[in-house]
Regions:
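N-terminal signal peptide c-region/cleavage motif recognized by signal peptidases
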Residues: 19-21
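Calcium-binding acidic motifs and repeat modules
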Residues: 13, 25-212
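Bacterial N-terminal signal peptides that target proteins for export
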Residues: 2-11
Length: 212
């Protein structure tokens, strides 16, 4: 068994990587480098209000850059065509269906759909051989406002993505804005170079203001 596919162990690793508290680095979704030019996030201190951990409260967090080519891996659970909250991304807000709790990180949330109980084939990849594949989407928040629209949603096929790794590599990387990227893997593409980076970003939390 790969230890990173075990939610309990993955949660303990997240705690260690993020300095003793899994929430210390903020709230996480999986982000994919669609432009294959590296992961470029927003400026320090510039954020949005978005309910990343799906608890009904909008979090003030740093975000992706405006006009960038980074995309959020998404699953439209509500069927309304857009992303409502972190339960429809892959991160700490992702429900672990067979366990009745939230995932410790995005890759654990994604890996559950590779299990045979949820229509997968347990090969370490999410592909069109897994039942979840047709439901996956990419949210490219072009205006970086934290509000999903129909125009910002893409299918994986339209982006040439053919497979998503579910077992990440470990690292502890802080970008210049203070976001933490403890996990990374590859998303496979038909076009060259054949794969692009996918990371679980723990966005830095920002101060909340009254009235939000």
């Amino acid at each position: 068994m790969n230890i990173l596919k075990c939610p309990r162990i993955a949660g303990l690793l997240a705690t260690a990587l993020l300095g003793g508290n899994a929430w210390a680095g903020g709230c996480s979704p999986i982000v994919i480098d669609l432009g294959n030019d590296g992961i470029h996030l927003g400026e320090a201190g510039v954020g949005v209000y978005f309910d990343v951990n799906a608890d009904g409260v909008r979090d003030h967090v740093q975000w992706v850059r405006r006009g960038g080519d980074e995309g959020f891996l998404a699953l439209d659970r509500s069927g309304n065509g857009i992303v409502d909250d972190g339960a429809e991304l892959f991160g700490v807000g992702t429900p672990l269906i067979l366990e009745g709790r939230s995932a410790p990180n995005g890759f654990v949330g994604l890996a559950q759909y590779d299990s045979r109980q949820l229509g997968g084939n347990d090969d370490g990849l999410i592909t069109d051989a897994d039942a979840i594949w047709p439901q996956l989407r990419m949210w490219v928040d072009l205006d970086a406002d934290g509000v999903s629209t129909l125009q910002e949603m893409r299918t994986l096929g339209s982006l040439g993505i053919t497979a998503l790794e579910t077992i990440p590599k470990l690292r502890k990387y802080f970008d210049e804005a203070g976001n933490v990227i403890p996990y990374w893997a590859w998303a496979m593409q038909r076009a060259r170079p054949g794969r692009v980076l996918m990371v679980d970003v723990f966005f830095r939390q920002l101060p909340k203001f009254s009235g939000t």
